[in-house]
Amino acid sequence: MTDEKQVSDSLNRQTAGNPYSAADPALSAEDNQHWLSFVALLQNAITQDLHLPLLQLMLTPDERTALGTRVRIIEELMRGELSQRELKSQLGAGIATITRGSNSLKTAPPQLKSWLEAQLLANKR
């Protein structure tokens, strides 16, 4: 079995019946397939404890920093104690980045919001 076929089969197994695996409307069909291939690769890397070196290979230091900042933005927005302007000052992020995070959070599925709350806020209150 070719590597491409293995990834395709893995994606099909992982996304079957999953309502969150639908095509990303922001991506072309081809780009969505590439995205899902990356997600499958990352999932496999996690099971083999290779996720950190994979992410270091795939993301520049600036991209890794940006992801960390986005996690902090979502965390603080969920906590709800700071205004977007205060977040901008505290995190050094642009107001547009914070607004995008806020808008994305508003449209996130309830199950994801609950999971994020448990992951990001449970031990930090």
From Swiss-Prot:
* Gene Ontology biological process: negative regulation of DNA-templated transcription; regulation of DNA-templated transcription
Q: Which InterPro entries match?
A: Trp_repress, Trp_repress_bac, Trp_repressor/repl_initiator, TrpR-like_sf
Entry keyword Chloroplast:
no
Instruction: List, in alphabetical order, the Gene Ontology terms for molecular function in this entry.
Output: DNA-binding transcription factor activity; sequence-specific DNA binding
Q: Where is this region: Disordered?
A: 1-25
Q: Name one GO cellular component term.
A: cytoplasm
Chief place of localization: cytoplasm
The record's listing under Pfam families reads: Trp_repressor
Looking at the UniProt entry, the stretches that span the membrane are none
User: Which portions of the chain have biased composition (kind: Polar residues)?
Assistant: 8-18
Q: What does this protein do?
A: This protein is an aporepressor. When complexed with L-tryptophan it binds the operator region of the trp operon (5'-ACTAGT-'3') and prevents the initiation of transcription. The complex also regulates trp repressor biosynthesis by binding to its regulatory region.
* Family the entry assigns: Belongs to the TrpR family.
Q: What is the official name of this protein in its record? A: Trp operon repressor
Give the species this sequence originates from.
Yersinia pestis
Q: In the record, what lineage is assigned to the organism producing the protein? A: Bacteria, Pseudomonadati, Pseudomonadota, Gammaproteobacteria, Enterobacterales
Encoding gene per record: trpR
